[in-house]
Amino acid sequence: MKKYQKKFIELSLKAKALKFGDFTLKSGRQSPYFFNAASLIEYGELSILADCLKAKVKEDGLKFDMIFGPAYKGIFLATLLANKMSEKKRMPVCFNRKEIKDHGLSLIHI
C-alpha cells in the first residue's frame, strides 16, 4: 500500500467518513460500507485529503487544465485539489449547480 493510500484510509476512519455495516445506497443497491465525504469537512483535516488526491493524480500521470467539482460535495474536493495543484501552475475550478438560480447570472455551470 502506498503512503498516500494509507494516509487516506487513516483519515477516513478518524473522521468517521468510512463506515462499515449494512447500507442502502441512493441507487437502491446494498453495500457493506458507506463513505460520507461531508465527514471529512467536519473533521477539519482537509489539507491531508488534498495531499492524497494530488499524490494520486501525480501517480496516474493525469494532465488537465481545469478541475470540475460536481454539486455539492464535489465542489470542496475540486477546490482543495486545485489549491494543491496551483503550487506549480494555475489550476482553475468549475462546478455545476443542481438548479438554475433565477437571479444573478442564472448559470448552471460556474
Label every model-predicted segment:
Residues M1-H109:
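PRPP-associated nucleotide enzymes
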